Amino acid sequence: MNVIIKAVVTASTLLMVSFSSFETSAQSPLLKEQIESIVIGKKATVGVAVWGPDDLEPLLINPFEKFPMQSVFKLHLAMLVLHQVDQGKLDLNQTVIVNRAKVLQNTWAPIMKAYQGDEFSVPVQQLLQYSVSHSDNVACDLLFELVGGPAALHDYIQSMGIKETAVVANEAQMHADDQVQYQNWTSMKGAAEILKKFEQKTQLSETSQALLWKWMVETTTGPERLKGLLPAGTVVAHKTGTSGIKAGKTAATNDLGIILLPDGRPLLVAVFVKDSAESSRTNEAIIAQVAQTAYQFELKKLSALSPN
């Protein structure tokens, strides 16, 4: 069966989630039902991908919807930059000149507070760290300039065989027009596929893979999302994406990542909350509850396999 969770406008203008069909993988229908119970009734369109270590395919909820990625695309961008480093086209130690007056203004950019002066130099490795771990928008756009812009990133994603993901704009372009964010989209299948490509360690050198893993584990944004309800100390390598709020609606509250189970195996989870009329706290709680549910589901499978 196929699962589509759709937000529909009621007479009171509230967006309510309804279920018309279901798409599942070989995973237990129980996990699907548990996730449904989390998202039903929420004033949002919610997409979910869960790919357990024993699954040949991911469980997908709302698989045909296009979700704005927002800063989630910084994962894809980091993979492209590191890929070019592996090819010898870029060097992690090469520096980029940053002119304070010429970069995107009035945006989330902690790197601009870390440096003094009207102009300064930043190594590519530090731009990557700020872009991934801190979701820095200025660092992101400087990296885009190095690799050839959004079109180059789109082509790289397609070259990996990920067809249900598109990138057409950088941070500055999204800031100029909030509707542009919807053109940087992914399906939940695309979200699952980028995580799988990274988890399989087939796209990057060992050194680059280790660096990106470290930066994702050190992510400072979205602590109440995938990580929010997991046991303390659980290793989660993830990347968030967040839009602004306009007319009471949040276009994107996202998180996708790799959660390490107690036995060290990877659990891949992506949760995207689109066009939500819920509070930011509720949007993040949806993500946390889905991650917790998927994690506990895998723990029960492990427990069932353990000798008494």
Swiss-Prot record:
Effect in UniProt of substituting N184D: Abolishes hydrolysis of benzyl penicillin, cephalosporins and aztreonam
EC nos: 3.5.2.6
Binding site for a beta-lactam: K74, S135, E171
Induction annotation: Expression is up-regulated by an upstream promoter, active in P.aeruginosa, but probably not in E.coli.
Gene3D superfamilies reported in the protein's UniProt record: DD-peptidase/beta-lactamase superfamily (3.40.710.10)
Activity regulation summary: Inhibited by the beta-lactamase-blocking agents clavulanic acid, tazobactam and sulbactam. Not inhibited by EDTA.
Family the entry assigns: Belongs to the class-A beta-lactamase family.
Note: The class A beta-lactamase family has a specific amino-acid numbering system, sometimes called Ambler or ABL numbering and often misspelt as Amber. A multiple sequence alignment was used to derive a consensus sequence and then the consensus was numbered taking into account insertions and deletions. This allows use of identical numbers, e.g. for active site residues, despite differences in protein length. UniProt always uses natural numbering of residues, hence there appear to be differences in numbering between this entry and some papers.
Quaternary organization: Monomer.
Name of the protein: Extended-spectrum beta-lactamase PER-1
